[in-house]
Amino acid sequence: MAPKKAKRRAAEGSSNVFSMFDQTQIQEFKEAFTVIDQNRDGIIDKDDLRETFAAMGRLNVKNEELDAMIKEASGPINFTVFLTMFGEKLKGADPEDVIMGAFKVLDPDGKGSIKKSFLEELLTTQCDRFTPEEIKNMWAAFPPDVAGNVDYKNICYVITHGEDKEGE
């Protein structure tokens, strides 16, 4: 009887994480998982993380950083564990902090900006892809500076508050 209860509890635990998100969100997480799972074995490991960082232009990630990321999970990081980890991190999180955190991943040097070309490539090739019209509208609302950099703090503010910061 005990093994059946344990199996039922494990199934309930995994089904609870899927109830935290709607189907669209789950699909977006699945797409993100697939992008990170570089070797397509269904498990995110240290090599997958290293290759993902390299694809984003960050080539000097230390083993300690990667080990710390992997150790955040209780075991191998399959999709259910991945979704659970995000569910736990997002539960009670301020949406502005979450969005800012996502941008900071793309800005390992902490400059507060990212290259327009890099952001445009991500937005047109990954997950919920932007149309050319959406890209045009975004650059009209958030024009890059003369060096081709985009201030993501302002984008984050507008996403979460619906209007530009006054005085910026």
From Swiss-Prot:
SUPFAM superfamilies in the cross-refs: EF-hand
Phosphoserine PTM positions: S15
Keywords: Calcium, Metal-binding, Methylation, Motor protein, Muscle protein, Myosin, Phosphoprotein, Repeat
A Gene Ontology BP annotation from the UniProt entry: skeletal muscle tissue development
Modified residues (N,N,N-trimethylalanine): A2
Pfam families linked to this entry: EF-hand_6
Miscellaneous notes: This chain binds calcium.
Ranges of residues in domain EF-hand: 24-59, 94-129, 130-165
Gene3D superfamilies: EF-hand (1.10.238.10)
Binding, Ca(2+): D37, N39, D41, D48
One GO MF term attached to the UniProt entry: calcium ion binding
Keyword Iron included in the entry's annotation: no
Name under which the protein is recorded: Myosin regulatory light chain 11
Organism: Gallus gallus
General function of this protein: Myosin regulatory subunit that plays an essential to maintain muscle integrity during early development. Plays a role in muscle contraction.
GO cellular component, one term: cytoplasm
Gene: MYL11
SMART domains: EFh (SM00054)
Post-translational modification: The N-terminus is blocked. N,N,N-trimethylalanine, found in other myosin light chains would not have been detected in the N-terminal tryptic peptide in PubMed:7358336 because it would remain trimethylated and ninhydrin negative after hydrolysis.
Taxonomic lineage from the root: Eukaryota, Metazoa, Chordata, Craniata, Vertebrata
Listed result of changing F103L: Results in 50% reduction in actin filament velocity
Subunit structure: Myosin is a hexamer of 2 heavy chains and 4 light chains.
